Amino acid sequence: MSLFDKICRALIKMIRKKPEYKKLWQNASPTSTFNPQALSLDGLAVKGVDGVRILTKRNSSDTDGALYITDIPLNEFSGKEIAGEAMFITGAYGKIYGYYRYFNIPKDRKTINISHGYDTSPSADVQANNHVVPVAIYSIVNGFKNGLWGGVLRNLLQPFVRGCFV
């Protein structure tokens, strides 16, 4: 097998690697308001985990089953980094108002801090813990492999690799 073939096979293996998700936490009462809390999630500190997926619903009383997804890369933060911690916002939008809640993962990855929920009105943000209610949290393996540049590299190389076998 030539060096070129080996490179092509390695690139294909990298591109085809699918993310794996493992449930770390589930809200026992997603139809109730969700107050701020720090969840202990030792599963985030496991070697190989490179991200976290948070599923939320717009409102604790929603019955339509719609979930909103927030993926947070843990190796290279793409959100704000404040006081050594990565902070991300997720939100769902109603007819007039927007809703949001902060998710903060310290660098030790042993907890996830969840803020109050907020309802944005035309005049100000109003605390509303029945909005953006977390439903489940998953660890992600291979979801952000090699960080942002790994994903960019994969996207750039896909046409080339496909051409290897044409």
State what each model feature region is.
Residues 1-5:
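Classical Sec-dependent N-terminal signal peptides that target proteins to the secretory pathway
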Residues 8, 13-16, 70-73, 83, ...:
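Residues marking helix boundaries in flexible regions
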Residues 90-166:
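Extracellular jelly-roll beta-sandwich "head" domains, especially the C-terminal globular C1q domain
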Residues 6-34, 43-44, 142-157:
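Glycine-rich, low-complexity segments
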Residues 59, 66-69, 73-98:
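Terminal beta-strand-rich extracellular "head" domains
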Residues 27-47, 59-69, 76:
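Surface-exposed ligand/attachment interfaces on beta-rich extracellular proteins
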Residues 50-58, 112-118:
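A short beta-strand element within beta-rich, extracytoplasmic domains
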Residues 25-33, 55, 85-89, 115:
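Trp- and acidic/polar-enriched beta-sheet ligand-binding modules for extracellular glycan
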